[in-house]
Swiss-Prot record:
Protein origin, superkingdom: Eukaryota
Lineage: Eukaryota, Fungi, Dikarya, Ascomycota, Pezizomycotina
Localisation per UniProt entry: Nucleus
Main location group: nucleus
Organism: Emericella nidulans (strain FGSC A4 / ATCC 38163 / CBS 112.46 / NRRL 194 / M139)
Protein's name in the database: Transcription factor dbaG
Length: 420
């Protein structure tokens, strides 16, 4: 390719076809074993071929690919092509959402999700983007609450516009083995959402008096839910659990590890969906432990939290062990080098960074997580933004605080990829 501009002697139609292929490679995970994995955007390629290569869904895929590669390669020509496609799609999507008589179908939902991902890719420190508008549009089409919890409940209820047949009536984060008491991860996450809302009501408003009985009951409920998650993790079958493939020693060349090189174990998984499910469960436990410690400090400032802090270090360490799997193209080659080069030589597919984005950000914001681990996670987010072409990762890495609904809408859009 020239420094910037279209490749010589290649027609626009072929450039768009290549962009479509790039999207399928970069963002779609087709499950090899459907007993273990739901995949990610796994039904999108057949859908595009059914609807046509110039359909709105196909053009939304191209817009995402042009934007992502334009950012990674510093090619304004590519980002401009993505921008043109994006704006062409906006009008038709808005009309479909505003006019129920047109009959919103699965293709409209998918287009809204993809345009939301486009906004997340194009976001940056000075331009947070408008992905929340597309999350709101998707929620309006599905007639659900505009939140990850609303989407989770729709998947569990078998919403008619949920595309991935493996998810309908089964939930979103399904594993071969239920947890303790037969609870699925989805069930536990719904309870966690309710618990979070209750804790925000009690603890976020200094004008509301705190009563011992309410705080004690909330801590007991939080502790019980943490136990449920422990049981869920222990109940999983060996073929669903991570497998250790290597170990990274501390680098003699760096005071603090670069992205992917936290010293310790390196794990592999069935696929990125399974890795994502595990990290959702881990960060959920970190959130619960953070709340337990916070409540305990109010109820009894002298209480000992050492075991909880050890648990958090172990959970975050397990997330770190999954990061090379998410971020590298060839995990075997990465491990074989054993940190000889303290930089990831061959970045993996952007979908790995996308699935990792929100669990890592949540963990990086929890006071119970040690500062050195928080700093490492911010490095990983910045790396995802730079080398995987997901601009919102840079914003999450550097913004001192991200507005709650902005974050929730991004999480909702990423989770929506499990439904397609």
């Amino acid at each position: 390719m020239p420094e910037d501009g279209p490749p010589k002697d290649i027609p626009d139609g072929l450039i768009e076809e290549l962009a479509l292929r790039a999207f399928f490679h970069d963002y779609c995970v087709v499950p090899v074993n459907t007993a273990l994995s739901r995949g990610y955007l796994g039904g999108l390629e057949p859908m595009v071929h059914r609807l046509g290569l110039q359909s709105p869904v196909a053009n939304a895929c191209k817009a995402v690919a042009f934007a992502s590669h334009g950012l990674k390669l510093s090619r304004p020509f590519l980002t401009k092509k993505g921008e043109i496609l994006y704006h062409e799609l906006l009008g038709s999507l808005a009309r479909s959402i505003q006019n129920p008589a047109l009959g919103a179908g699965p293709d409209i939902v998918v287009t809204a999700v993809l345009l939301g991902l486009y906004e997340m890719i194009m976001a940056g420190e000075s331009n947070p983007g408008h992905h929340n508008a597309h999350a709101g549009g998707m929620a309006a089409i599905l007639q659900i609450e505009n939140s990850p919890l609303g989407l989770l409940q729709a998947a569990r209820a078998g919403h008619p516009l949920v595309l991935n047949r493996m998810v309908q009536n089964n939930g979103m984060f399904i594993s071969p083995s239920p947890g303790g008491g037969g609870q699925s991860l989805d069930t536990i996450l719904v309870k966690l959402g309710s618990l979070w809302q209750k804790s925000e009501t009690l603890l976020s408003n200094p004008q509301i008096p705190l009563f011992f009985d309410e705080l004690y009951a909330l801590r007991e409920e939080t502790t019980a839910l943490n136990r449920d998650l422990i049981l869920w993790q222990k109940a999983q079958s060996d073929n669903f659990k991570p497998t250790k493939v290597g170990y990274l020693s501390p680098s003699p060349y760096q005071l603090s590890p670069s992205a992917g090189f936290w010293p310790g174990q390196v794990d592999t998984y069935v696929d990125l969906y399974v890795a994502g499910v595990w990290n959702v469960s881990r960060v959920a436990r970190c959130f619960l432990i953070n709340l337990i410690v916070r409540l305990s400090n109010i109820l009894d400032p002298t209480s000992d939290h050492r075991q909880y802090h050890n648990d958090v270090r172990e959970l975050v360490g397990d997330i770190f062990a999954s990061i090379p799997f998410h971020l590298t193209e060839d995990l075997g080659a990465f491990v074989a080098k054993r940190g000889a080069n303290p930089e990831i030589a061959n970045p993996g597919r952007p979908v790995g960074g996308l699935i990792l984005l929100h669990p890592v950000y949540i963990a990086s914001q929890l006071p119970v997580v040690p500062p050195d681990m928080q700093e490492y996670m911010r490095k990983c987010l910045a790396w995802i933004g730079k080398y995987m072409g997901i601009g919102q990762a840079c914003l999450l890495a550097k913004a001192p605080r991200v507005e709650g609904q902005y974050f929730a809408c991004g999480c909702m859009l990423v989770w929506a990829g499990l439904l397609i």
